[in-house]
Amino acid sequence: MAVPKRRVSKTRAAKRRSHYKIALAKPIKDKDGSWKMPHHINKFTGSYK
């Protein structure tokens, strides 16, 4: 089992974790031409995409 040779500082750990981001969902164009967020129901047409 691997064991750390020396302690990782808070700053170094934070710099490494700065890339662990969730990408924001981009709106998509619906069949009727309106923009909406993915995986949401359109109130007017009732479509789910």
UniProtKB/Swiss-Prot annotation:
Top-level division of the source organism's lineage: Bacteria
Biological-process GO terms, alphabetical: translation
GO cellular component terms, semicolon-separated: large ribosomal subunit
Keyword Ribosomal protein (UniProt): yes
Cysteines engaged in disulfide bonds, as pairs: none
Protein keywords: Ribonucleoprotein, Ribosomal protein
Record bears the keyword ATP-binding: no
GO molecular function: structural constituent of ribosome
UniProt cross-references to PANTHER family, sorted A to Z: 50S RIBOSOMAL PROTEIN L32, LARGE RIBOSOMAL SUBUNIT PROTEIN BL32
HAMAP family: Ribosomal_bL32 (MF_00340)
Name of the protein described by the UniProt record: Large ribosomal subunit protein bL32
The organism of origin for this protein: Helicobacter hepaticus (strain ATCC 51449 / 3B1)
